[in-house]
Amino acid sequence: DAQESRGLGDVYKRQVEKNLPSQAGMGGGSADAAATLRALDFIFDTRLTDEQLCSIGVALGADVPFCITGGTRLCQGVGEIMSNLPSPDCAFVIIKPDVGISTPEAFKKYDSISNPKRCNMDVLLRYIGGGKLFGICSNLFNVLEYAADREEIAHAVHELKNSGALSALMTGSGSAVFGVFPDIASAQTAAEKLSGWSYKCVCQPVKQGWEFVY
C-alpha cells in the first residue's frame, strides 16, 4: 500500500464522510479508496506519482485509478489504462430511484445476453474531441442499462428527458441515472422540478478527481 511503498508500517484510523449512495453505479467505494490513498500520500509525505498511486489503487478496485486522477478519460483494460480527453462544456443532474443494483449481478446479467447492443466508440470519441455536445449526447449508450431492463431506471430516464436533458442514461451498473444539460442554469432549473427521488444532485465536469480542503 502507500505506506509500505515508503517503508511506513504504522496502523492508522481514518473517518470517511460518504456522500454518494451505495448500489448507485457512481463509484462511491472507489472514490473513498482514492481519497484515502491521496490523503495517506499527503499526510506521510510519500510523494508517490499518479502512476504509483494508480498501481496501488487498481488492486483495490477497477475504478480507483480513475478516481485518483479524474477528469474526462477513456478507460480501457479493467480501468487502469487511461487516456486524457477534453471535458465537454455541460452540466449533469443525477437522480437515484429507491432501488439498488448489485454490480456483480449487473455484469452477470449482461454476460447472459448473446448479442448486446454497443455504442460506436470511434464516433463518440470524435464528438468528444471536437467538443460537439449534441453529437456526444446522440451517441451515448450504457450496455449495463440495456442489460438491467428495470422499470425504475426507465422512469428516471424519462423524467430527466422530460425535464430538458439532451440525453439520459444509467450511471455505471446503476441504479442512479444522469441527464446531460447544456449549462448549469438549465440543470439547476430541471433539478428543482424533479421530486420524489432518494438522491438528487447537480454537477459539472472537473479536471481532477480530488481536492484537498483544509
Question: What is each PLM-predicted segment?
Answer:
Residues T49-L60, Q188-A191:
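Short, well-structured alpha-helical segments that form the helix of a local strand-helix-strand
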Residues D1-Y12:
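Single conserved hydrophobic/aromatic residue that forms the stacking wall/gate
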Residues R14-G25, L166-A168:
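Short pre-catalytic strand/loop immediately N-terminal to key active-site residues, enriched for Gly-Thr
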Residues T69, L74-S167, P182-S195, V202-Y214:
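Conserved, helical-rich catalytic subdomain that frames metal- and/or nucleotide-binding sites
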Residues A24-D50, F66:
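DPxDG-like acidic metal-binding loop motif
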Residues G28-G29, T171-S175:
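Glycine-rich beta-strand-to-loop/alpha-helix junction loops that act as flexible
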Residues F178-V180:
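Short hydrophobic/aromatic beta-strand micro-patches
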